[in-house]
């Protein structure tokens, strides 16, 4: 709370999950799927102890997903369906989750780098007009990740459910001209895994199956260090085969798909996306930075977001970066490679890094009036109040 006794809320609206809680806490109070579902047919009023309503949100929508038409209001980190997004916020602030009186609270929200201004304006408008928060701040996700890691300078590789960003931050300011975006993230890997499992003869086609395959992915997928070697193992042995029990009791076997699905992050062409993979994009980003800052960036690469949780991802990233540096900078001179210092930080709680950084920032700033956009300022200036966010949130 601030000195006036107002709660300070932190809400990290991801494409796949909402992480919300309070300033100063070191874990989100609530984490739930960012989905909204509507019953396909109204047959029963209750399933187990969950009442079926015309509109189901979050955890309940996820549990009853086989009976619902489910929608994600956000796609690639950007709100696509504002009506559903409001339902999601009603659920977040209402009795089911935070249960707060929004009029007497401040809120820190997060947004992806390179977020369209229109999107940010609309978020601020909804926060002040619909929920009437007393203060609002919108922070860039990558900067919050570094705060959570106790750094002011570094490169964040943030890969969530909807979008992957590579975002260099220098002395606490994100560098928009160097920020790169890759529209491949958790959701695309899940889709690709569905396709790969289909080739094995398992059909997952209902919108509810998507959640099931996501769970398979989280449990079994990993990033191969040496892709040729993994493929050889998959073809010639059964070492990689694991069984997975589906919600209906059926058991399926998953083998080479375990590393083939996340490989799309490194080789986008596998899912028909043009452009370079995450390792090369990271290399290009750092090489495009000012020559004096490059070595700092190579030494402070921070992973963030659920799609960086694959076992094997940090070591594969390091291997590819060294390879690219050797070929393109050192022109093959192996002798000099030993001088090349690189460090990839993979904090164990990186799934919630953005929230943690937001909780730290909101706590430090809770009483600083010049930090928050206030309801009064919004009433006077409208969306021009965003100018107050200044350069840090470009």
From Swiss-Prot:
ATP binds at residues 160-162, 214-218, 305-310. It is found in: Cytoplasm, Cytoskeleton; Cell projection; Nucleus. GO terms for cellular component: Arp2/3 protein complex; cell cortex; cell projection; cytoplasm; nucleus; site of double-strand break. Gene3D superfamilies: 3.30.420.40, Actin, Chain A, domain 4 (3.90.640.10). PROSITE patterns: ACTINS_ACT_LIKE. GO terms for molecular function: actin binding; ATP binding. Its main location: cytoplasm. One of its GO terms (biological process) is positive regulation of double-strand break repair via homologous recombination. Keywords: Actin-binding, ATP-binding, Cell projection, Cytoplasm, Cytoskeleton, Nucleotide-binding, Nucleus. InterPro entries: Actin, Actin/actin-like_CS, ATPase_NBD. Belongs to the actin family. ARP2 subfamily. PANTHER family: ACTIN (PTHR11937). ATP-binding component of the Arp2/3 complex, a multiprotein complex that mediates actin polymerization upon stimulation by nucleation-promoting factor (NPF). The Arp2/3 complex mediates the formation of branched actin networks in the cytoplasm, providing the force for cell motility. Seems to contact the pointed end of the daughter actin filament. In addition to its role in the cytoplasmic cytoskeleton, the Arp2/3 complex also promotes actin polymerization in the nucleus, thereby regulating gene transcription and repair of damaged DNA. Component of the Arp2/3 complex composed of ACTR2/ARP2, ACTR3/ARP3, ARPC1B/p41-ARC, ARPC2/p34-ARC, ARPC3/p21-ARC, ARPC4/p20-ARC and ARPC5/p16-ARC. This is Actin-related protein 2. It comes from Gallus gallus (Chicken). The gene is ACTR2.
């Amino acid at each position: 709370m601030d000195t006036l006794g107002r709660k300070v809320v932190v809400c990290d609206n991801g494409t796949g999950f909402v992480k919300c809680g309070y300033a100063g806490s070191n874990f989100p109070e609530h984490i739930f799927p960012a989905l909204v579902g509507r019953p396909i047919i109204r047959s029963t009023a209750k399933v187990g102890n969950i009442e079926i309503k015309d509109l189901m949100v979050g955890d309940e929508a996820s549990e009853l997903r086989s009976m619902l038409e489910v929608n994600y209001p956000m796609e690639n980190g950007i709100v696509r369906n504002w009506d559903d997004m409001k339902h999601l916020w009603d659920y977040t602030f209402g009795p089911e989750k935070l249960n707060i009186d929004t009029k007497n609270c401040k809120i820190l929200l997060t947004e992806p780098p390179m977020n369209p201004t229109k999107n940010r304006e609309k978020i601020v408008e909804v926060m002040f007009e619909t929920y009437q928060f007393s203060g609002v701040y919108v922070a860039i996700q990558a900067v919050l990740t570094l705060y959570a890691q106790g750094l002011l300078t570094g490169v964040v590789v943030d890969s969530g459910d909807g979008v992957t960003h590579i975002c260099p931050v220098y002395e606490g300011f994100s560098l928009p001209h160097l920020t790169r975006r890759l529209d491949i993230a958790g959701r695309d890997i899940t889709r690709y895994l569905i396709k790969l499992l289909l080739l094995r003869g398992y059909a997952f086609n209902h919108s509810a199956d998507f959640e099931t395959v996501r769970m398979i992915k989280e449990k079994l997928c990993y990033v191969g260090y040496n892709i040729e070697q993994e493929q050889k193992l998959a073809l010639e042995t059964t070492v990689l085969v694991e069984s997975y029990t589906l919600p209906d009791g059926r058991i399926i076997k998953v083998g080479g798909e375990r590393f083939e699905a996340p490989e799309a992050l490194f080789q986008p062409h596998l899912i028909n996306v043009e452009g370079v993979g995450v390792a090369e994009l990271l290399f290009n980003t750092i090489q495009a930075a000012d020559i004096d800052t490059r070595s700092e960036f190579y030494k402070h690469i921070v992973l963030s977001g659920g799609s960086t949780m694959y076992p094997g991802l940090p070591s594969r990233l390091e291997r590819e970066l060294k390879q690219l540096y050797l070929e393109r900078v050192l022109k093959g001179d192996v002798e000099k490679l030993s001088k090349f210092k690189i460090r990839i930080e993979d904090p164990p709680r990186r799934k919630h890094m953005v929230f943690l950084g937001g909780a730290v920032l909101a706590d430090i700033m809770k009483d600083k009036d010049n930090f928050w956009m206030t309801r009064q300022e919004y009433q006077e200036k409208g969306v021009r109040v965003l100018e107050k966010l200044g350069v840090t949130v470009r």
